[in-house]
């Protein structure tokens, strides 16, 4: 009885048997699953590449002998390994020997309060945030998109005040969107 049932095909006005329709539905389902598997493999490859870069970056940071050189190592590692065109870091409330270092200069009380108010990294357009001014402009192009990462002890969403801010920028308005 079921072999004689005819159903209209979604790919035309012709009638097809129930078995043909079920086989067609299974082919479509398999095709969808294949796409999902390809996406998972692609994501896995991306994750492996990111893990390798993070490992290279942290290894380079561990090789820094002088704490004075650490902020520059953080910034240069991010720019080179992660292809971030613009990056800067500022820290405040530092020990005496570091008080005049470049990485401790230029953070106003407003910028410090703003960094402390961030309970998660900000990613989006450059809306004229003061920390965007800390970035060196590559080829005269100002940052159109930013990632602002507060530096604090403990979890990023803790009530602990930030002791610094890592700023990533790009002339591409969608890079950190």
What is each of the regions a protein language model found here?
Residues 103-147, 167:
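Regulatory sensory and allosteric helical modules in signal-transduction proteins
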Residues 144-157:
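A short, aliphatic-rich beta-strand micro-motif
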Residues 162-165:
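Short glycine-/small-residue motifs
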Residues 1-10:
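Short, positively charged
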Residues 157, 169-177:
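Regulatory loop-to-helix N-cap segments in sensory/regulatory domains
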Residues 14-60:
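Signal-transmission linkers at sensory-effector interfaces
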């Amino acid at each position: 009885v079921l072999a004689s049932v005819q159903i209209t095909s979604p790919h035309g006005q012709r009638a097809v048997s129930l078995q043909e329709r079920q086989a067609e539905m299974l082919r479509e389902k398999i095709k969808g699953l294949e796409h999902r598997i390809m996406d998972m493999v692609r994501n896995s490859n991306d994750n492996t590449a990111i893990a390798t870069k993070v490992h290279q970056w942290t290894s380079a940071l561990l090789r820094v002998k002088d704490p004075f050189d650490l902020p520059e190592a953080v910034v240069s590692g991010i720019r080179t390994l992660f292809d971030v065109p613009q990056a800067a870091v500022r820290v405040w409330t530092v020990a005496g020997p570091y008080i005049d270092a470049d990485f401790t200069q230029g953070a106003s009380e407003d910028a410090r309060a703003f960094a402390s108010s961030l309970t998660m990294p900000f990613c989006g357009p450059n809306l004229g945030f003061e920390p965007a001014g800390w970035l060196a402009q590559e080829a005269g192009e100002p940052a159109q998109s930013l990632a602002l990462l507060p530096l604090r002890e403990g979890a990023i969403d803790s009530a602990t005040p930030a002791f610094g801010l890592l700023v990533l920028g790009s002339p591409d308005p969608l890079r950190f969107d």
